[in-house]
């Protein structure tokens, strides 16, 4: 199974790249974790936000292809670490690759939300999208460590 993080935004601070890459390199070869960045639409005073969201959504769904789609969204289901490990196991058994979608400043398009098989809430707080990349990578790595009895996660 391959994991994909499909995220709106291309110019992240160095600390985001450093944090994300740290967890990316730890993933096992049989579970590669790939980042696909979708350019954010131009937002200005008179921007048509609906059109921008729709275009970003189309690009995200095209990147995801036929993968299982999991959106990251505040109203999604909150999973603690053991629950995420169980989800990871279910995804592996399903046999499809998984695309996790992170929207832009206005969130995800209606098409992305409709295409999602699952919606995951990291927190009831609104988190900065660059930070979410690092949190998702660490959380999935920790979940993997539980499923393989790797010593990274401690109770």
Swiss-Prot record:
CDD domains (UniProt xref): RlmH-like
EC number(s) on file: 2.1.1.177
Coiled coil: none
InterPro entries: Alpha/beta_knot_MTases, RlmH-like, tRNA_m1G_MTases_N
Keywords assigned: Cytoplasm, Methyltransferase, rRNA processing, S-adenosyl-L-methionine, Transferase
Gene Ontology MF: a single term: rRNA (pseudouridine-N3-)-methyltransferase activity
Function, as annotated: Specifically methylates the pseudouridine at position 1915 (m3Psi1915) in 23S rRNA.
Protein name as catalogued: Ribosomal RNA large subunit methyltransferase H
Organism whose genome encodes this protein: Salmonella choleraesuis (strain SC-B67)
């Amino acid at each position: 199974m391959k994991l994909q993080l499909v995220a709106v935004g291309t110019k992240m601070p160095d600390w985001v790249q450093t944090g994300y890459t740290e967890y990316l390199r730890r993933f096992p070869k049989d579970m590669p974790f790939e980042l696909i960045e979708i350019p954010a639409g131009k937002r200005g005073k008179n921007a048509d936000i609906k059109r921008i969201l729709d275009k970003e959504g189309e690009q995200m769904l095209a990147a995801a292809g036929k993968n299982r789609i999991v959106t990251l969204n505040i109203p999604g289901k909150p999973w603690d670490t053991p629950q995420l490990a169980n989800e990871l196991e279910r995804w592996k058994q399903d046999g499809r690759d998984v695309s996790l979608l992170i929207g832009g400043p206005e969130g995800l398009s209606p098409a992305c939300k409709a295409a999602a098989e699952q919606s995951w809430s990291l927190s009831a707080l609104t988190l900065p999208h660059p930070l979410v990349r690092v949190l998702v990578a660490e959380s999935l790595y920790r979940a993997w460590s539980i499923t393989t009895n790797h010593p990274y996660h401690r109770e």
